[in-house]
Amino acid sequence: MGCLSSEPTAAPAMQPRAPAAVPDDAHNGERVKRRDVTPDGVYLPNANRLAPPMRSPDYVQISTAAAMTLGLVPGRMHRCRCTRCLNLLLTYPEGCRANCAYCGLARHREADHDYADRNFIRVDWPSVPVAQLVETVAGQGAATPFERMCISMITHPNADADTRSVLKAWTGRIAPERVPVSILSNPTTMTRDDVRALRDLGAEIFTVALDACTPALFERTRGRGVGSPHRWAKYWEIFHAARDIFGREKIGMHLIVGMGESERECLEVVQTVKDAGGHSHMFCFFPERGSLMDHLPATPRDQWRRVQLARYLIDYMGVRIDRMRFDEGGRVRDFGLSRAELDAVIAAGIAFRTSGCPGARRADVSACDRPYGDSPPSKIASYPFQPARRDRARIRRQLAGAAP
């Protein structure tokens, strides 16, 4: 069977640090909300000035890669075009009211950054008027570079209604058949009716960012352990509602690898999601600047590559976790395929690309390529392009524990 001979890296204890105190005048975005300034056009994050009071559904934030693709900011991405997915993020002066330990958008960052200036998955997120954004993409017609659009919700009292408003504005000008729409949901504020409404308005895929792979880890990084409102059971409740409403192959689950779970624990969630008719979208833990886990190490590459490979086998190759073998620490020691079969999957390289909602090409290649969202370009975790021969050679060394 397909075994690996590396000596696995031990998982560190991943304990969030305590947050800094938030000044009274910074709570709930008060400094920004008191500004008597009307937002004007695109806002580029700048921590050296006070942000204007921008608010969804009139404004959204977009990833740096999307802003580069649209020509709103200069630059180009290392070894790839910018992105094939237009990622939108709801925005409010109050920001996200959750306090997830690994997230750059967390509530505790009121102490040091206005919401519109906070980094998220390693990059800045410029703010753009929704009307301008929709008209720009609509004007591109069939030539648009985007194969998918995704609305990312945050924890805010208005998030559900504003997500519907942004979705209506988009589908009113851009047919979902031309640019399919995904929703990255916030289960904490949602009901089953909210899920159904998004489907009825034209969303194709519904995803849940569980992120933490065990109930205890979820509680420590996303729940009561950090004064955050999220609950493990609620996330699964909304995921199962989405399965019923959107159907099989139209649901997804975000998972972060390397926050203290074992490889087996992570892959058990992957198998559960697959059995429900969904796919898992994987992120390699990276210490986000300003987060409560920014002092902790990134996921060791041998661990990450094993989980990437095993997840691909479960999601797309029909391999079940009960065919795999694990050591006493829960690390994958056998992937449940012959050596020749496993070598062929590794050689193809697709297992090591960014995972997410599919694009126009094939089901196992994500439109949401999130360039360098979980690693620097010098040490790529999720390849936003097809790995070249030299990349695949490095991946093999990483799987063998012989390369960082």
Predicted regions and their residues:
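Core AdoMet radical
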Residues: R107-T136, Q140-D162, E177-D194, L201-W236, ...
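Auxiliary Fe-S-binding modules of radical SAM enzymes
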Residues: M1-P19, H27-R84, I245, L267-P404
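Conserved glycine-rich "GG(E/T)P / GGGxP" loop and the immediately following alpha-helix
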Residues: E147-R173, G258-E265
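N-terminal pre-triad scaffold of radical SAM enzymes
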Residues: Y59-R109, R148-I151
